[in-house]
């Protein structure tokens, strides 16, 4: 009995079916997770947000060496910006690298003209510039700008002092580095409905990145980090846990999809389809899914358009028409209505 009670702590807790992707680009993603137990929206949302912001690795320029320049307070002949301004502009360059090893990238430009991040060359092609339009310097007629930069992988924010090592040449200038590929993370917790209950959480998570990592991957990596960090707190053998696949019917038989207990009114059907189901006295999804396509098409005013609408909505919930629900026991309130 003690073990059964222990497993009930998490086995009986409601869990989200899947993550709904509302928007997905290389730079922005919006994800909805529901239903969650009350309080878990803010618990999970806050934890994921903090991990996404602080713990994902990215690439950044950590030092620069400019021809004929000894320190950051210098100027370069024929270049509008001084070295301090050039360094500030280099901090804005966003990179993507395919290796964890330090890499060297270069600029060799001649005026007149504007130097942008797109002028950066990666000798071995392992470093990709994500914002090639980013401004670096302005050169006048006859001016040249030759720079060699070091790219490293890290996480969070590193001050210039931390990017300096004993073997750094005197004319190499370490710079502050923002490694995080994340621009911004936001989450909102709202209400989610399961059957007639509305006291569940819905977590909406928005992630903005610099393009070096996809938003959906950022969320997945953060979830993996959180999972790995939490494993140490589990003080029992998980392999001994009895299998728990879902909700059983009242007789203790096979497991059935939770959505079967929902009302057809929750499907947000068109007025025509909704009226057809009402006329056919179909109130719950378990009644609907037992009907075949041919049976539904015999319903008055029910056509192909309504059929396709219902099939699509059922498929989203893992259901379909013509299902065999042998052993399924309807909710007690439905039995009472039929008496």
Swiss-Prot record:
UniProt domain comment: The N-terminal domain is essential for RNAP assembly and basal transcription, whereas the C-terminal domain is involved in interaction with transcriptional regulators and with upstream promoter elements.
Family: Belongs to the RNA polymerase alpha chain family.
Record's protein name: DNA-directed RNA polymerase subunit alpha
Region annotation (Alpha C-terminal domain (alpha-CTD)) ranges: 256-339
EC number: 2.7.7.6
Region (Alpha N-terminal domain (alpha-NTD)): 1-237
Subunit structure, interactors included: Homodimer. The RNAP catalytic core consists of 2 alpha, 1 beta, 1 beta' and 1 omega subunit. When a sigma factor is associated with the core the holoenzyme is formed, which can initiate transcription.
Matches recorded under InterPro entries: DNA-dir_RNA_pol_insert, DNA-dir_RNA_pol_RpoA/D/Rpb3, DNA-dir_RpoA, RBP11-like, RNAP_asu_C, RNApol_insert_sf
Entry function: DNA-dependent RNA polymerase catalyzes the transcription of DNA into RNA using the four ribonucleoside triphosphates as substrates.
UniProt GO MF annotations: DNA binding; DNA-directed RNA polymerase activity; protein dimerization activity
Gene3D superfamilies: 5' to 3' exonuclease, C-terminal subdomain, DNA-directed RNA polymerase, insert domain, RNA polymerase, RBP11-like subunit
Keyword line: DNA-directed RNA polymerase, Nucleotidyltransferase, Transcription, Transferase
Cellular compartments per GO CC: cytoplasm; DNA-directed RNA polymerase complex
CDD domains, A to Z: RNAP_alpha_NTD
Keyword Transcription regulation tagged: no
A single GO BP: DNA-templated transcription
């Amino acid at each position: 009995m003690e073990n059964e009670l222990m497993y009930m702590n998490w086995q009986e807790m409601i869990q989200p079916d899947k993550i709904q992707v509302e928007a997905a680009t290389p730079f922005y993603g919006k994800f909805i997770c529901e239903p969650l137990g009350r309080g878990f929206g803010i618990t999970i949302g806050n934890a994921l947000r903090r991990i996404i912001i602080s713990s994902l690795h990215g690439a950044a320029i950590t030092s620069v060496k400019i021809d004929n320049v000894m320190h950051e307070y210098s100027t370069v002949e024929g270049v509008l910006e001084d070295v301090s301004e050039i360094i500030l502009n280099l901090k804005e360059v966003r990179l993507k690298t395919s290796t964890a090893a330090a890499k060297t990238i270069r600029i060799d430009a001649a005026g007149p003209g504007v130097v942008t991040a797109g002028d950066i060359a990666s000798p071995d092609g392992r470093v990709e510039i994500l914002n090639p339009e980013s401004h670096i310097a302005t050169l006048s007629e006859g001016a040249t700008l030759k720079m060699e930069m070091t790219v490293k992988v890290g996480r969070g924010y590193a001050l210039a002092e931390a990017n300096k090592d004993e073997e750094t040449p005197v004319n190499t200038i370490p710079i502050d580095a923002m490694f995080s590929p994340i621009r911004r993370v936001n989450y909102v917790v709202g209400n989610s409905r399961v059957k007639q209950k509305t006291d569940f959480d819905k977590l909406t998570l928005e992630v903005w990145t610099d393009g070096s990592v996809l938003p959906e991957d950022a969320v997945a990596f953060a979830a993996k980090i959180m999972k790995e960090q939490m494993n140490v707190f589990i003080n029992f053998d998980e392999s001994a846990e009895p299998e728990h696949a879902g909700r059983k019917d009242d007789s203790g038989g096979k497991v059935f999809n939770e959505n079967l207990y929902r009302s057809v009114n929750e499907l947000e059907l068109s007025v025509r389809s909704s009226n057809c189901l009402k006329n056919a006295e179909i109130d719950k999804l378990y009644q609907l899914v037992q009907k075949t396509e041919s049976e539904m098409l015999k319903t008055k005013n029910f056509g192909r358009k309504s059929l396709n609408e219902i099939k699509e909505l059922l498929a989203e919930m893992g259901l379909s028409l013509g299902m065999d629900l042998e052993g399924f026991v309807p909710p007690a309130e439905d039995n009472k209505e039929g008496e």
